[in-house]
Every structure is written in C-alpha cells, then in structure tokens.
Amino acid sequence: MKKILFVVATIFMALFLNAKENDMRNLKDIYLAGGCFWGTQAYFDKIRGVIKTDVGYANGKSDKTDYHSLHYSGHAETVHITFDENIVSLAEILAHYFRIIDPFSVNKQGNDVGSQYRTGIYYNDSSLKNSISEFIKHEQTKYDKKIAVEVEPLKNYVLAEDYHQKYLDKNPGGYCHVDLSLADKPLYNESKFKAPSKDELKAKLSDLQYSVTQEKATERPYSSEYDKFDKKGIYVDIVSKKPLFSSSDKFDAGCGWPSFTKPITTDALGYNRDLSHGMERVEVTSNLANSHLGHVFTDGPKDKGGLRYCINGASLKFIPLEDMEKEGYKDYIIYVK
C-alpha cells in the first residue's frame, strides 16, 4: 500500500511541479494550537499541499517567552502552517485539525494540561476570518456541546527553540498525543460509499457511463449536461457516490468537457501514467472505486495553480447544495462557496 501511495504522490507532484514553472502558488498561513506541538506539526507535515511548518508560541501577553515560561506568559503551543490554497483548501486544513483535537476540552489535550495546551486558530490575514468562522459554525452543528476552540487574530508569535522544531523527525517514537496514522487515511468516513460489482454497474449505469468509468472511454466533447453547468453543489463519482469536485473549483475551459482546478479534497482522486493513443498523459480516477474520470493537464488558470482536470461528465453525478445534507453530504457543505 505504501508503495502505491508513493507512486501516486510521485506522479502528482511531478505534474504539479511542472505546472509551477512561474510559481503559480497561492500561499496562505494559518496558526493552529492543538496541544503539544510535536505531534500536531508531524501530522500536518504529512498533508498534501502543506508547504512548510514551524512551531512556536502564540497569543500570549508579550512578544517574548520560551518553553519554560509559558505558564506565566500565557502563550499557546502553536504550529505555523504555510499551505498552497491551490492544492488544499483552508476548510480541509481545518477538518484535519478538528480530527486530531478534542474541541471541547479546555486547557488540556491528551495527557498535557495547562493553558499552553489550549486549542486555538489564529490568523494574520483578515481575509481568512470569515472562512474560519463559517467552518466553526458548520462544525458546531454536529454537536450539542459548545466548541471550546478560540479564534483570534495572531499576536506575539514567538518561534520555538530549535530543539522543538520537527521534534518527531529527530526523535522517532518520541512522545506524541496525535495518531499520526490518521494522516494516511481518508479524511471522512467512507463506509457509506461502495464500489459495486461489474454486474451491478451494468444494470445501474447507462452504456456511456459504464464505458467511460469501466473501460476508459471518452464522451464526445460538448455532449455533457455538466459542460456549461454552473449551479452550486458537489460532483460525486457516479459509481461509488464519493465526492470528487466542488462547484467552487469548476470553470469553463472551452474544451467541451467539465473542467475543475482541483479536487474537493486532496484524497479524493488517484493518478496514473497514461501512454495510450501515442500520448503521455496523467489519468485521473476516483480513489475509492478506481473509476476512470478523465485526465489532468497543466494548461489551467494560472491564478488557480495551473491545473485543468478535464473530466467526463458521464463519470459524475451532481448534488445541489440545497440537497447535500439530506443526501448524506453534510460534511462537504463547507467546500461549496
């Protein structure tokens, strides 16, 4: 499994780096306090689209502190994350964050107790404030208990000592309150998404849907109802019903097929080298059912990262925003703007 993931990651990164000739990145910074920063940093270093991280102390009383003074200075152990929003959305970053914290615990995460171990989301870019607030509001609907994560502008961030930077890289097996294996698993529960048998698919899918998803056929350009489609919602795999793309990332490429700048989450798709028809391309598949979707090219909008996911409409099913909750896609509403 690890070998497969490495090959997929290698194909993706080679493709993406090729699209980055003019540095078409959209870098953003977020500061996350989630208990002991050793484990939190190690977790986010595994997430695709995270460019770099460092650990420090945030939102204390002054611009000076150190590890041994946190009890007095009021700072929280915090991970500074720089991510490329053209690869991974802030919503996905925050979904990962909530995955590894207890959002109701006050001044305690894992075995660590004290105000320095409180949870917090801090920002130095006011344009992120509304997105963070919307995410928290959406997350709160899942619980009766009030979320205890503080959301504030960043202040008095102090870089931690070298000893703490990449601590678990330097000390494998060191103390960690975070289950790092979660970073290699699907972000959301996929138990409700199934890959039917070939016989079931032949009975459920149209001839075109079957030939595209199972036999790697290509629909005629300009033939899909989704080509010029611009309603808000998500596009799911016609086979497994797993979410693949958001309408927020859809654009009209003029090529005759539905086009997107990125998948809805970084774990939604698979990538394969395709040498068919005398060309070298990157095939895009659904990660769960391995349905053929189309290909990804490096001629997309530069301000969105330069990628164009050229997708057969026959491989997709659209779920309108207003129907997402009743159809079982509540977790994904936050990805639709």
Curated annotation (Swiss-Prot):
It holds the Pfam family PMSR. Keywords: Multifunctional enzyme, Oxidoreductase. The keyword Transit peptide does not apply. The keyword Oxidoreductase applies. Signal peptide: none annotated. Residues 198-321 form the MsrB domain. It comes from the Bacteria. This is Peptide methionine sulfoxide reductase MsrA/MsrB. It comes from Campylobacter fetus.
